[in-house]
Amino acid sequence: MIDVAPESKKAKDLKGDFWDAKNIQISIGEIITEEKPPEEEVKGPKPRPHVTDLRSWDMKLLERYEPFYAPFCDMCCLCTYGKCELLGKKGACGIDAATQQARTVLLACLIGTAAHAGHARHLVDHLIERLGEDYKIDLGSNVDIEAPITRTVMGKRPATLGDLREVMDYAEEQMSHLLSACHTGQEGDSKDFESKAFHAGLMDDLTREVADLAQIVALDLPKGDEDAPLVELGFGTIDTEKPVVLCIGHNVLPGADIVDYLDENEMEDQVEVCGICCAAIDVTRYNEAAKVVGPLSKQLRFIRSGVADVIVVDEQCVRTDVLEEALKNRSAVIATTDKMCLGLPDMTDEDPDKIVNDLINGNIEGALILDPEKVGEVAVKTAMKLAPIRKSLKKLPDIDEIIELASECTDCGWCQRVCPNSLPVMDAVKKAADGDLSKLEEMAIEELCYTCGRCEQECERNIPIVSMVTKAGERRVKDEKYRIRAGRGPAQDVEIRRVGAPIVLGDIPGVVAFVGCSNYPEGGKDVALMAKEFLERNYIVVTTGCGAMSIGEYRDEDGQTLYEKYGGQFDAKGLVNMGSCVSNAHVSGAAIKIANIFAQKPLEGNFEEIADYILNRVGACGVAWGAYSQKAAAIATGVNRWGIPVVLGPHGSKYRRLFLGRADDEEKWKLKDLRTGEVIDGEPAPEHLLYAAENREEATVMIAKLCIRPTDTPKGRQMKLSNYIDLHRKYLGTIPDDIDRFIRTEKDIPIVYKRDVMKILEEKNWKPRELPKEPSLLER
């Protein structure tokens, strides 16, 4: 088989026994010795969409859900024209405040997307180097639609690891165009910047799917296993008598090779391997013997505890002062990716034993090793030799020392002023000076303090407040023993067939996905309580990353974690841990599969029809209660483009932009019924696309509300409104005053609340309206 390429050679004369020709041009391309299966036909109108190809869909979303901007400041300081004040003015380049905010949002989304894309590129290239380009993508007999995002965006199914390189090439090309639009004197419209942010979010979705797909098939991670094992979670599960290797970050390769080295040398029981953040999630997907310390909020506390003999860092969400903190108690640091070199010498080509000796003897502060297999050997050998030397360092300041340190406090109050959650830090320190550690202990046990360390930076007496908080909570650390279900990967096709109709018709009231980071306003318990609320109400609860860990750190009144109480099936009352940050792609993927499997919508190149279906029919809502990073911004924006609303915590307003609907503007909610061709009155469902709630109570009510969809059957709508009203009464004390907007006919009214609701309807002069048969925002 000859694959024609553009390079060519010309022959002036070509003669033979039966051939005589001149000026023949022959193109010779790659010679392929093995026949490849024919590529699937591209079915949809827009495969591999360029920056503007989905702009019309974006504008429909932005017309309904107008951007609400909350800038940190009114200045633009991006070029040497500035700095320019934009409050009621334009900058020297002509940009206004809204457009500048939209550009900032696009930049944040691109940073997040680049982080996931860089991660995916690392994985794909390394795994191809190990296994070859022809390594098959196979998720088992229960998953036929193994890459729903890739199929929809690229227009074809990836069959091998090599095919994923093509996906990465496309995403990286799009990111280059998007970033160029941020240059001074380029895009000048805020909504077009938002359209580009949507495209960046879609590229983020795409590259996350590539990353998780590659590691699932190449490392044999669970392939949609609803019975994925329960693994250990919490400080108290770590055996501090053993050498301890701690992995921090998101790239599974170094951690997997550490586990492999232990296994190959029959040392599994001699060394503890644990992780913080998504590295922990993915290492336990690879080997259930590894342990999860907790979400990224545990990072500084655990490093300060001195438990880790070796700290292996890869990429994303690692404290940039990790080396400085590790050196305080002689923990060895190994950096493993080009994203985070920490100023360390590159030891990739050095003999492993030499690296170990240099680390043990303090000849180097740490090592940069870009070969994951070598990381495995060096990390284990270093931990084995360093642990006996460091045994006396695995402790925090004693109680008397804490009292002495606290007595240095000058009552300046700066620790409280700079605390992101305005915790009573100074009061806790003052009580500690009197020998009362209860307030410090409360901050540790209730996870109110997520150890950002800003209080220490401001303290004029250099009081190590985070270390004091950690020590105060130490006596309870031994009780921090929980169970979390290992990340299972995508929803199986058979599960989608089972739940597709109940979700679209409203019989299952919704799919709620708790994702994101641990920048919580009042601790991780809030996430667990919200998850518990919706599990008890028959929702499907999906989770990933730090959110999955926070849910696991809660025990109910029976002493069980929610993972022990609820199964891992993608079905009503299922608590589904899909995996790490990159596994968030399976949340969007499940919604896409519903459109394909239940509604028979073709995927390939058919983004707009799929997104339109999800927006109007699939009752799903994302919750990023502790979102802090640019990655979280990209994830939320990508999910929004598919038509899935997201609720943020109060810190989410710092992303500078929300997508809020106006329920009072009836024109914005009109729908086209594709079955009849008529434009009909709609309802604010979902009312918002990106919303920041002030507290758990408000968020819980809003989540239930954002699962309402125009296609709910009367029975399904009754169920959804029953939850909405019940939660509103439970947390806010009243029946919602907008309930009339969601009653289409009297059949929608929950029987339990019929009298109260009918009274409201009469007061508001409510009129019944027609139910849409096939609602859409599209013209066709």
UniProtKB/Swiss-Prot annotation:
[4Fe-4S] cluster 3 binds at C409, C412, C415, C459. It comes from the Archaea. Keywords: 4Fe-4S, Iron, Iron-sulfur, Metal-binding, Nickel, Oxidoreductase, Repeat. Residues 399-429, 440-469 form the 4Fe-4S ferredoxin-type domain. GO terms for biological process: acetyl-CoA metabolic process; response to hydrogen peroxide. [Ni-4Fe-4S] cluster binds at H250, C278, C317, C517, C546, C581. The keyword Iron-sulfur applies. Its cofactor is [4Fe-4S] cluster; [Ni-4Fe-4S] cluster. GO terms for molecular function: 4 iron, 4 sulfur cluster binding; anaerobic carbon-monoxide dehydrogenase activity; hydroxylamine reductase activity; iron ion binding; nickel cation binding; peroxidase activity. Pfam families: Fer4_9, Prismane. It catalyses: CO + 2 oxidized [2Fe-2S]-[ferredoxin] + H2O = 2 reduced [2Fe-2S]-[ferredoxin] + CO2 + 2 H(+). CDD domains: ACS_1. [4Fe-4S] cluster 1 binds at C73, C77. PANTHER family: ACETYL-COA DECARBONYLASE_SYNTHASE COMPLEX SUBUNIT ALPHA, HYDROXYLAMINE REDUCTASE. HAMAP family: CdhA (MF_01137). Cluster B is an all-cysteinyl-liganded 4Fe-4S cluster; cluster C is a mixed Ni-Fe-S cluster which is the active site of CO oxidation. Cluster D is also an all-cysteinyl-liganded 4Fe-4S cluster that bridges the two subunits of the CODH dimer. Contains two additional 4Fe-4S clusters, dubbed E and F, that probably transport electrons from ferredoxin to the B cluster. Heterotetramer of two alpha and two epsilon subunits. The ACDS complex is made up of alpha, epsilon, beta, gamma and delta subunits with a probable stoichiometry of (alpha(2)epsilon(2))(4)-beta(8)-(gamma(1)delta(1))(8). This is Acetyl-CoA decarbonylase/synthase complex subunit alpha.
